[in-house]
């Protein structure tokens, strides 16, 4: 897998950092847009491993840091779930202009909820996949514990998530509550693949059941037995990427173009064609 660094303008004009993962030989049949988990980054090992597995299926993967996170510009305190959705749409627009429009959307954790909401604004996407996604974005507030009252009363507070400090604002929390996911999932209108671990301690398996129930067919569920929420074990993220790649080929594969007899003869080649009846081989 090769990673090509890129930058593009997010929804608020901030310059966002991205990576385009492509197969070693550069041959790409489709592109996927990947949304990372809450307060994570495009360089999370799980995201990289999923990308590596997809490139083996000739699916390029565009990963980026949301505004205010990772190597991207902007202030995290001024962002929210709605701005994440807008950043995804901005990324898809950039891909369509400069690379290739995303044929598949993939989201991890809150990024999974974001791709479910963004899908109706990204018409090129023919399939959607979520990994450990919450049914309701407001589920994220469980991470703030008893600081929620302080956020509501004071307007903002600093919380520690995975050893890092983030300023969480009242507008961020209120925005999480303003999204009706059931209707959005019901009108997705695309094949959906849901990955979730039955032992996920951050986003319980009941969330996957609700997403599955709200979605229409074709929809599929894959249980990530014994996996943690962040897919810290390499085998888990590689498994997700491998299964996702096989599933995606059904929906985003490039059309097969058969060579004509004249094209087969070109370049000093000899080709044989077998018929469908009797035992006959034709040298063309």
Regions found by a protein language model. Give the residues of each.
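The serine-hydrolase catalytic nucleophile loop
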Residues: 39-51, 66, 206
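Short beta-strand/loop motif that positions the catalytic acidic residue
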Residues: 188-189, 194-196, 200
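Extended beta-strand/beta-hairpin segments
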Residues: 247-284
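Hydrolase active-site cap/lid region
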Residues: 123-171
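Catalytic histidine-centered segment of alpha/beta-hydrolase-like enzymes
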Residues: 227-239
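Alpha/beta-hydrolase active-site loop
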Residues: 78-98
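N-terminal cap/lid segment of alpha/beta-hydrolase-fold proteins
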Residues: 1-26
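Conserved alpha/beta-hydrolase
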Residues: 51-73
